[in-house]
Amino acid sequence: MAELLRSLRDSQLVARFQRRCGLFPAREASGEEHVVKNYFYYYLFRFSAALGQEVFYITFLPFTHWNIDPNLSRRLVVIWVLVMYIGQVAKDILKWPRPSFPPVVRLEKRIIAEYGMPSTHAMAATAISFTLLISTMDRYQYPFILGLMMAVVFSTLVCLSRLYTGMHTVLDILGGVLITAVLIALTYPAWTLIDSLDSASPLFPVCVIVVPFLLCYNYPVSDYYSPTRADTTTIVAAGAGVTLGFWINHFFQLVSKPTPSLPVIQNIPPLTTDMLVLGLTKFMVGIMLILLVRQLVQKLSLQVLFSWFKVVTRNKEARRRLEIEVPYKFVTYTSVGICATTFVPMLHRFLGLL
């Protein structure tokens, strides 16, 4: 078993996969970082890698909430936040390095400073795809085999993209998938509780804010700075904001037509041009408001924190300090989550888009 685990952590295994897919290191004299000999795999896995990054989740999850099913989006967000927090913390506790360069070709630079085990891209992709499958199979009428195939293909492409980009070993990916499978199995009995969070007691908002903030503020200390803590705070804060937004809607009765709780069997309506235009309009309106709120709250929170701690405003290194980074990220993305679930639907209603 130990020999098998060592072989799965071997960087040469990742390098061989890259070579099979047409990705090679460039010669030093060429001035290039890598050579691509198969652009089909290059674009396939670069696109697949994007499916596990922030740009996908800040588009897919809001789109699901505004156009498909708010209850489904809440469940997806809660599970996503849970697996991502555990995965990010596990990275900084285990401190396993990423595949070595050389022989591996690295296509991503931003997260090189992070540790590798487990792959949070693999965890997020597996969590989103299979939570979506499990949550919809008793709510919408569609061929289960088709849904299962789509979930497997989605998560597999994201996992393979982490090998292609040189960011993870095979063991990192298998570990991420296994951890996610265990978390889904353990939390599944409590999924109905997630659906009733909006009817919790008036003290619920305090817990939703205080507990996630403390989890982020007491994040494991790394040997050197990496974006892991900031990314984790962003994810956890967004989840707290979404959960709080649902509670606000219920407590203040801001939802004019309550959505039925899961599960309710429904037919998937056919996609028409009018539905597509309406959905894209709601999405664009919502995203613009979210970006506006994000920009305003981030700027205001940074100004307050810089003033409080007497820090030079344009000092980029100051943003990385624990007492500044966590509060400003948390306030910003909690506001984004509340905006997405409360103010955007109100704007949609005002504009006649509901």
Curated annotation (Swiss-Prot):
Tissue specificity is: Highly expressed in pancreatic islets. Expressed in lung, small interstince, colon, kideny and brain.
Q: What is its main location?
A: endoplasmic reticulum
According to its record, what are the GO cellular component terms? endoplasmic reticulum membrane
Q: Where is it located?
A: Endoplasmic reticulum membrane
Query: What SUPFAM superfamilies does the annotation carry?
Result: Acid phosphatase/Vanadium-dependent haloperoxidase
Span list, region Phosphatase sequence motif I: 91-99
Catalytic reaction equation(s):
sphinganine 1-phosphate + H2O = sphinganine + phosphate; sphing-4-enine 1-phosphate + H2O = sphing-4-enine + phosphate; (4R)-hydroxysphinganine 1-phosphate + H2O = (4R)-hydroxysphinganine + phosphate
Which spans are transmembrane here? 43-63, 76-96, 115-135, 140-160, 173-193, 202-222, 235-255, 273-293, 334-354
Pinpoint the site Stabilizes the active site histidine for nucleophilic attack. D172
Q: Output the Pfam families linked to this UniProt entry.
A: PAP2
Q: Where is this region: Phosphatase sequence motif III?
A: 161-172
Keyword Heme included in the entry's annotation: no
Topology class, membrane:
Multi-pass membrane protein
Q: Which Gene3D superfamilies match?
A: Phosphatidic acid phosphatase type 2/haloperoxidase
Q: What is its EC number?
A: 3.1.3.-
Q: Name one GO biological process term.
A: regulation of type B pancreatic cell proliferation
Q: What class of enzyme is it?
A: hydrolase
Give the disruption phenotype, in one or two sentences.
Answer: Mutans are viable into the adulthod. They exhibit smaller pancreatic islets, defective beta-cell proliferation and decreased blood insulin levels after treatment with a high-fat diet. Beta-cells show increased expression of proteins characteristic of the endoplasmic reticulum stress response.
Name the segments for region: Phosphatase sequence motif II: 118-121
PANTHER family in the record, alphabetically?
Answer: SPHINGOSINE-1-PHOSPHATE PHOSPHATASE 2 (PTHR14969:SF14), SPHINGOSINE-1-PHOSPHATE PHOSPHOHYDROLASE (PTHR14969)
Record's protein name: Sphingosine-1-phosphate phosphatase 2
Species of origin reads Mus musculus (Mouse)
Q: What is the lineage of its organism?
A: Eukaryota, Metazoa, Chordata, Craniata, Vertebrata
